[in-house]
Amino acid sequence: SNYHPNSLAQSLRGRNSMQIGVVVSDISSPFCSSMVRGVGHTLLEAGYVPLIVDSKDNLELEEHLIQTLLCRRVDGLIVNTASYVNPSLIRVACDGVPVVLCDRYVSDFRFPFVGSQHFSVMPKLVSHLKEEGFCKVAFFTQEYHTNSARFNRRNAYLQSVKEIFPEENGEALTYVLDLSDNKNTARCIRNLLDSCAPGEVPAIIAVNSVTCSHISGVLDTMGLE
């Protein structure tokens, strides 16, 4: 085995700093802002001080920040991780540091996890949109292969479309966006509209609040609602 215990992490055992490291993937997103408020309030009520850092959805930066938090002798970590594949975080847990994942999980290791119930919520949303008269429902997402939350939301969407809009191809209605490329997003929206018959109106489900805000801005520039 190539596993070597981390002496710094092991030195944390038996010590209480009453500090918890909180690693978020994008502090500017509404979700992370809400998460920080909720986690911070809960920790303070329990007598812990949250040390909050932002990885900017960058795995290398996340790894650096976690090591910095460990140097501060935190008693544990709450992590909204940047990547589904995260051997560094697994090593930290194996070294004895308590780690809880929030919203996004990691492959190949069973961390304590707090997240959304995508597969119970998505069918209700898609069914509601059909009842409202939308002809089809598209799914607009950022790259999802290394992000478990986006990946699960996409899979929940595909399953829901298969059940509620059996005549539609959920894969074909999934659009992967680069949020820095407004022109490409506009092309995706136009492609979706062109796939509808005259008079029909499609709906768009955004993978998260940041994507939703981006789509809304592009729709405004296109003169659409």
Predicted regions: what is each one?
Residues Y3-T68, R72-G76, E143, N155-L158:
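Amphipathic helical "hinge" segments at domain boundaries
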Residues H41-V49, H64, L70, C94-L101, ...:
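Bacterial carbohydrate/catabolite-sensing allosteric modules
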Residues Y84-C94:
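Active-site-adjacent beta->alpha loops and helix N-cap segments on the catalytic face
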Residues N2-N6, E60, T81-A82, R187, ...:
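Short gly/ser/thr-rich secondary-structure transition/capping motifs
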Residues V23, I78, A203-I205:
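Structural motif
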Residues K56-L59, N80-V85, S209-T211:
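Short beta->alpha connector loops
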Residues V79-N86, R104-R110:
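Acidic, Gly/Pro-rich loop/turn segments at junctions of secondary structure
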Residues R15, E60, N86-P87, F109, ...:
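Generic structural signal for helix capping and beta-alpha/helix-loop junctions
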